[in-house]
Structures are given as structure tokens and as C-alpha cells.
Design a protein with these regions (language model features):
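Phosphate-ester processing/binding pockets and catalytic centers
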Residues: 1-195
Length: 195
């Protein structure tokens, strides 16, 4: 089985997920808003990353300033005649303005500075649970292995032990898998940059 994770997208969605506490009425537009934020960040990566670094994202201390800077950046481009104004992007901007006034974005506060994703092991365990009849061979990842060693997965009260970690240089199948994953990564990067 193959699974791909867009690290940038996954690192951004906590901003949008933090907004549901104050804007539950817009939950139906969740995917559109997340997509608009992702597309905007792809288009204006350097400027957004600068804001993230200055605010030690995802450990934002001054939520009001963080939200105001993101809002100003969106306003500067979303109102530009060269940039097609986007409903979801404007909705995000308005929601961020409110969050800034409340000084609250719960999922991007009180985290380790600059640590965008801490729990990669969840993606591994998810595969093991979804495909519980399969045996999963993962390339050695020491941090993930340590986290998974403390877990017990069950299906119908029966423990799951359908995974193992191996050194890629010792397993030809993992080497081939790494090669294919590398090619797919290049394809996805190309698609991100050209679509």
C-alpha cells in the first residue's frame, strides 16, 4: 500500500481547525478553506514562512499580531486585479480577524516552536489498522519505532502485530519501494508547482 503525506498541508490545517471554536457555522466549508489557505501559502511561500518564523509557528505567542499579519498578506493579494478573489480565502481572512481580536488559535499555541509535525507514528498505525489483514514492512524510523513500541493496537479485542521495521539496505523490497516513492514524490512536487 502506498500513502503520501503533504507535510505543508498537514502543518497548515491546525490554523483552520483552530477557527471552528469561534466559527462553527462555517464548518461545512472546512475543506474549501483549508484548500484556499494551502494554495495561498504555495503561491506566497516566502512571505508566509517569514511570518511563521517570526511567530515561532506552531507556538504562536501573540495570536493577534500573527492573525493580523496573515490577514494583511491575504488582503494585499486577494484584492489584486491579477489575483482572482477567492470566497474561501476571504472567509478565512475574516475568521482570522476574529481570532486575532480574541487572541486565540488553540491548535497553534503552547506547542514546541518550529516543530510542525510531532506524531508521524499516527500515519503508520493508521495503515496497520486500516489494512489489518496485511503485513506492513516499514523502513527503519527510530522515532516512529519508539513511539509505536509503547502502543497496543487491537481489532475485535485481538492484538495487532502486523508490522515490522527493517533497514532498507537489508531488504530489496524496501529499496524498490523507496525508489518508487522517490519517483512519486518528484511527480507530486511537479504537480504542486505546475497546477
Amino acid at each position: 500500500h502506498y500513502s503520501a503525506l503533504n507535510n505543508l498541508y498537514y502543518s497548515l490545517v491546525d490554523i483552520v481547525d483552530s477557527l471552528w471554536e469561534t466559527h462553527p457555522q462555517w464548518l461545512m466549508y472546512m475543506w474549501g478553506i483549508k484548500g484556499a489557505l494551502y494554495d495561498f501559502v504555495i503561491e506566497h511561500q516566502d512571505e508566509v514562512i517569514d511570518i511563521f518564523i517570526r511567530h515561532t509557528y506552531p507556538n504562536v505567542k501573540d495570536v493577534s499580531a500573527f492573525c493580523n499579519e496573515i490577514c494583511s498578506l491575504i488582503w494585499g493579494y486577494n484584492d489584486d486585479s491579477e489575483y482572482d478573489p477567492d470566497f474561501f480565502l476571504e472567509l478565512l481572512r475574516q475568521m482570522l480577524k476574529t481570532a486575532g481580536k480574541l487572541d486565540k488559535l488553540i491548535f497553534v499555541q503552547d506547542n514546541e516552536p518550529f516543530m510542525l509535525i510531532q506524531e508521524y507514528y499516527i500515519f503508520y498505525t493508521e495503515r496497520c489498522e486500516i489494512f489489518s489483514k496485511s503485513h506492513h514492512i516499514f523502513d527503519e524510523e527510530l522515532t516512529v519505532q519508539k513511539q509505536m513500541s509503547n502502543l497496543e493496537l487491537y481489532e475485535n479485542d485481538i492484538p495487532l502485530s502486523n508490522w515490522q521495521f527493517v533497514k532498507s539496505h537489508e531488504n530489496i523490497y524496501v529499496q524498490v519501494s523507496d525508489l518508487i516513492a522517490g519517483l512519486l514524490r518528484k511527480l507530486f512536487l511537479f504537480l504542486d508547482e505546475n497546477s
